[in-house]
Amino acid sequence: MSCPNWYIIELNRFRIVAWDDAEAQNADGTFAVHDLDRIDYLKHHLGAVGKAIRAGVPVEGYFLWSLMDNFEWAHGYTKRFGIVRVDYDADCRRVPKDSFAWYRTVIASRELPEE
């Protein structure tokens, strides 16, 4: 039995909100703005959310972590989770990453782009 089917049968009285979903990058600057791994991660996770909704799971929402790179309790500034890069060495200048543009398109269209 698949997880969505198990959920529908056993736990359908609860609503689901997926939150704090993130793909981290190292803070060494590698792929700091061109974050294709994050886009791939989001495609798979949002695709799974869509599949669950189509299967009848009552998903109420999805929250991406995070809008901007920030201080993480477990990692300090060594991991970057944001879809906007924060340059900690240059007055915290903010630069939208490729994932920002991709996620903006998804939100505006309310669907995942075709490959």
Specify the residue positions occupied by each region the protein language model found.
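Non-catalytic scaffold segments within catalytic domains of secreted glycoside hydrolases
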Residues: 1-115
